[in-house]
């Protein structure tokens, strides 16, 4: 009964903390404990959750998990202290009402099994009574009292030795006091300073950490990316980093708390113990805790930025139905070419040498023109790696000889080389060379960014900030969640999807994804959703979780084309029948006419389908193959080229956001180097974070602010240059 009450109490705390209703929180936890996935709950249990999205559901679950860990730790600490016979009612109350793991650890500290410390050694020598006597602040001389504890056998050779041991015990007593630690931690955070100085300049060859050679910033104000930069500089042995604390104020606080009689001769020894306890035990420990907390906050921010950038990259609009010529640029080894048809099938692989040292420019030109003509190429995708700009110039020259409209796009090829050398790429294209696979990946990345990018480790897609400096476990969890959310929001064509894409579908594991592809290759395309029930290891619960996200576009049942879950098919058929329609009318104008402007509230009562679900069903019936990505702005199509030398201050351009970081955004304006829009130049209004204004893949209007041709750098502004 106590556990049930405790759960309800924790849920109420969660409601207060996150601002959701008790019903929403309770249902999210219940649905998850019943084995439902986040995408499934978000899409198909809207009546239960009040239409919470994936991010909100995850926030509830993460906080709930922390609370459960906290409760487990409280129970363990209560048991451990209880076994020692030292659990008072007051201590129990403090532990039970603690809201952070750190508070529980502070309360447990005095009772923790310690390794041998100065204090434990002093206690072994029988000096605890002397420490207790000092804290009584009697009028007697402590040096005389200490003589009673001199004992050669116990290695207490003098009164000084005895007093030192007693001070060590008092120092640890001060350090173990939970309320003192809490006050010191809060005061240090409010008034402390993060400081860095140069340790070994020689190790900073590129002067990356120059601004931190002599740097100070209040702990309360330091921004996340500076915390991570300092940490990295310290790790690379370039910087010395520390927390400067308000020592005087802290010592005064401890003095006031510990010394009850200034006139007593004991006060001097207790003061020495306080100062030692703070400097030797509390300060290093609090500094570690604060730096750990700042690092965790900074890591969360870096992970959040990476996740947002990745989400925007994955959800870039696909260029559907286009025959694409992809070019993976290079100098010496030549530019690899790949033609992929409108389904992503590879039609042609080739190589050209338009650049030095080989430079067969005219031959390369003829070959590309022939390919464009033969395969009726509509788009050219150029990877943005080595030799990208020179290749762009070459393609622009080629296109001048093409009479119809053929556009080109610079495609972010980050991770393409990682993918092309992977086992997955070898399985997919066993007969192709690594560079040839890379060209195919670039072309397909333009046609369907999501389907292609899921094949690559998210950490390799080139939109992170300090991703190697953060908790890899936490980063992987967050990025996997982003990919899963994107894949399930878009939906998957079960007859064309790769294992890499299917494994992110709600409820599916990599093994089941492989089984689906194996069955498809063996028996041909699936014609109805129910056929998936025959897949090995795809049980009833897995089927329920995944099936709504898997589409069959040319199947026997038109509802299988949609995002409508089969659990609603009977209701949907009754709904259509009541309107004089059938499932064969899905997506047709007559159905659209019948459903547009319908009274959803009234229809919901008549059909017993919840309103939020009914709205989704109506949308799916009207636009069965709707892709949320199609509503976003298409990538920037190009025909001409721009050089760094062409740029002038104040020039107005359009560009594509390639990466967003704490201090601004990098924008591809068509020159060799992406330009930086500093956070201060993003908007006339105050911008708390660049992500509030821009996102990866967004097309933005910018003005050239400054050009450094020597370093190849361009500063941009999203505000007109006056």
Language-model regions, residue ranges each:
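Generic start-of-chain signal for non-secretory N-termini
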Residues: 1-26, 33
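C-terminal accessory/binding modules appended to enzymatic or scaffolding proteins
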Residues: 19, 317-318, 484-518, 639-677, ...
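Accessory alpha-helical DNA-binding modules that contact the DNA backbone or grooves
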Residues: 37-38, 49, 53-156, 489-631, ...
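Long, charge-rich intrinsically disordered scaffolds of nucleic-acid metabolism proteins
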Residues: 103, 409, 415, 420-490, ...
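Low-complexity, acidic/Ser/Thr- and charged residue-rich accessory regions of DNA metabolism proteins
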Residues: 147-159, 215-216, 244-247, 251-278, ...
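Long, charged amphipathic helices and adjacent flexible linkers at domain junctions
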Residues: 289-307, 460-491, 604-649
């Amino acid at each position: 009964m106590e556990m049930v009450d405790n759960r309800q109490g924790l849920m109420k705390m969660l409601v207060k903390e996150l601002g959701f209703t008790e019903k929403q929180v309770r249902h999210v936890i219940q649905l998850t404990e019943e084995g439902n996935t986040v995408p499934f709950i978000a899409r198909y249990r809207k009546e239960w959750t009040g239409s919470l999205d994936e991010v909100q559901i995850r926030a509830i679950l993460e906080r709930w998990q922390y609370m459960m860990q906290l409760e487990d730790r409280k129970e363990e600490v209560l048991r451990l202290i209880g076994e020692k016979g030292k659990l008072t009612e007051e201590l129990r109350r403090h532990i039970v009402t603690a809201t952070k793991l750190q508070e529980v650890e502070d309360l447990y500290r005095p009772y923790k099994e310690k390794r041998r410390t100065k204090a434990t050694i002093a206690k072994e020598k029988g000096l605890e009574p002397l420490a207790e006597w000092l804290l009584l602040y009697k009028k007697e001389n402590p040096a005389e009292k200490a003589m009673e504890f001199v004992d050669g056998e116990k290695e207490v050779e003098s009164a000084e030795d005895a007093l030192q041991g007693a001070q060590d015990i008092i120092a640890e007593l001060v350090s173990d006091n939970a309320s003192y630690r809490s006050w010191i931690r809060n005061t240090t955070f409010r008034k402390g300073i993060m400081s860095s100085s140069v340790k070994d300049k020689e190790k900073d060859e590129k002067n990356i950490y120059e601004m931190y050679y002599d740097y100070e910033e209040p702990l309360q104000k330091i921004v996340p990316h500076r915390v991570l930069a300092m940490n990295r500089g310290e790790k690379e042995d370039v910087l010395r980093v520390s927390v400067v604390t308000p020592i005087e104020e802290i010592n005064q606080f401890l003095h006031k708390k510990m010394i009850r009689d200034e006139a007593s001769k004991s006060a001097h020894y207790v003061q020495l113990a306080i100062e030692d306890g703070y400097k030797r035990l509390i300060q290093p420990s609090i500094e570690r805790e604060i730096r750990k907390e700042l690092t965790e906050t900074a890591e969360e921010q870096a992970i959040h930025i990476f996740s947002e950038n990745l989400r925007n990259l994955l959800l870039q609009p696909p260029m559907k139905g286009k025959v694409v010529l992809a070019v993976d640029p290079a100098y010496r080894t030549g530019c690899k070419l790949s033609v992929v048809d409108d389904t992503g099938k590879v039609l042609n692989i080739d190589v050209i040498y338009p650049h030095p040292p080989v430079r067969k420019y005219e031959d390369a030109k003829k070959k590309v023109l022939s390919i464009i003509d033969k395969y009726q190429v509509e788009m050219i995708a150029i990877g943005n790696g080595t030799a990208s700009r020179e290749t762009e110039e070459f393609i622009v020259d080629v296109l001048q000889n093409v009479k119809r409209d053929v556009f080109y796009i610079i495609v972010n090829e980050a991770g393409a080389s990682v993918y092309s050398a992977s086992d997955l790429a070898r399985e997919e294209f066993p007969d192709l060379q690594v560079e040839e696979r890379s060209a195919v990946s670039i072309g397909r990345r333009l046609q369907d960014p999501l389907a292609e990018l899921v094949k690559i480790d998210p950490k390799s897609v080139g939109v992170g900030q300090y991703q190697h400096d953060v908790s890899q476990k936490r980063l992987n969890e967050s990025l996997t969640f982003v990919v899963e959310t994107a894949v399930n929001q878009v939906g998957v064509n079960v007859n064309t999807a790769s294992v890499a894409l299917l494994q992110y579908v709600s409820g599916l594991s990599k093994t089941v994804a492989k089984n689906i592809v194996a069955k498809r290759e063996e028996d041909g395309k699936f014609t109805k959703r129910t056929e998936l029930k025959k897949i090995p290891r795809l049980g009833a619960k897995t089927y329920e979780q995944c099936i709504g996200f898997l589409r069959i576009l040319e199947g026997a049942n038109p509802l299988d084309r949609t995002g409508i879950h089969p659990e609603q098919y009977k209701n949907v058929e009754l709904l259509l029948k009541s309107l004089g329609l059938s499932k064969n009318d899905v997506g047709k104008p007559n159905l659209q006419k019948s459903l547009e402007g319908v009274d959803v509230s009234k229809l919901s009562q008549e059909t017993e389908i919840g309103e939020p679900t009914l709205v989704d069903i109506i949308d799916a019936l009207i636009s069965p193959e709707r892709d949320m990505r199609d509503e976003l702005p298409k990538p920037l199509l190009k025909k001409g080229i721009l050089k760094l030398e062409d740029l002038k201050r104040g020039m107005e351009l359009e560009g594509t956001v390639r990466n967003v970081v704490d201090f601004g955004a990098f924008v591809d304006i068509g020159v060799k180097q992406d330009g930086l829009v500093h956070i201060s130049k993003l908007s006339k209004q105050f911008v708390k974070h660049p992500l509030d204004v821009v996102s990866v893949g967004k097309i933005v209007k910018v003005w050239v602010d400054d050009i450094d041709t020597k370093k190849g750098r361009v500063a941009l502004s999203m505000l007109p240059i006056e």
